């Protein structure tokens, strides 16, 4: 925008994120290649408006976020609700599920995915625990979330963008990383164009008006 001489306020960007963020995230999820067959699941405390909430998050063996859900409880009913979201997001049932020893996970596992391996061994769930760190950083930067709806919208949208650029830099060469990053950037720019969020102004009336001779 700045390169085109367009001045935008912070409030405009915030309103655009509210309006177009969920649509943008849905488009990215459709383009995603799918998740792995091992889910690492964990929940953390999040305080919103003085009330305690639980942020449930699941990542696969590649570090991609499979699902994020904010709930008031962490009982068996809440666990089953989160597991159902994960099954809708993935193309098939996971081969292995790694959690801590919270009993709610056992309830959801027995009723929804009994054929999957349920691993509750110590230190096995470190990947899910580490995935909460970026959320804590953003939570401090935003001076805590203002509402559950805002938190759910922000975290779901950010997860879709994170998956797009989670390329596994430590596993590939610099040449391949540049190629994959270029593809991710092209997709990131292409999705807003398809949604009508961004319209390149080369042929817009503004540009035509600027080039019209003055009378």
What are these regions (language model features)?
Residues 141-143, 152-215:
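C-terminal domain-tail junction helix/linker
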Residues 13, 42, 58, 63, ...:
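Mobile genetic element proteins and their domesticated derivatives, centered on retroelements
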Residues 19, 68-90:
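Active-site beta-loop-alpha junctions of metal-dependent nucleic acid enzymes
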Residues 6-8, 15-37:
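Short, basic alpha-helical nucleic acid-contact segments in DNA-binding proteins
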Residues 35-48:
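Two-metal-ion RNase H-like nuclease active-site motif
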Residues 101-156, 160, 166-167, 172-175:
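Helix-centered, glycine/charged polyanion-binding patches within enzymatic domains
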């Amino acid at each position: 925008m700045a390169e085109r001489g367009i001045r935008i306020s912070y409030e405009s960007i915030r309103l655009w994120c509210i309006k177009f963020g969920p649509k943008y995230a849905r488009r990215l999820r459709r383009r995603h290649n799918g998740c792995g067959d091992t889910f690492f699941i964990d929940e953390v405390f999040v305080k919103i408006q003085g009330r305690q909430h639980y942020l449930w998050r699941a990542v696969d063996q590649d570090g991609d976020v499979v699902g994020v859900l904010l709930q008031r409880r962490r009982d068996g009913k809440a666990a089953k609700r989160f597991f159902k979201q994960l099954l809708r997001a993935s193309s098939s049932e996971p081969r292995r599920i790694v959690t801590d020893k919270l009993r709610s996970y056992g309830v959801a596992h027995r009723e929804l995915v009994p054929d999957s391996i349920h691993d509750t061994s110590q230190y096995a769930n470190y990947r899910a625990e580490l995935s909460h760190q970026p959320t804590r950083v953003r939570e401090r930067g935003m001076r805590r979330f203002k509402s559950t709806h805002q938190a759910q919208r922000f975290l779901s949208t950010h997860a879709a963008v994170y998956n797009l650029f989670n390329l596994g830099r430590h596993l590939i060469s610099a040449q391949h990383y540049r190629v994959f990053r270029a593809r991710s950037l092209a997709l990131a720019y292409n999705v807003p164009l398809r949604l009508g969020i961004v319209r390149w102004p080369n042929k817009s009336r503004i540009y035509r008006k600027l080039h019209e001779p003055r009378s």
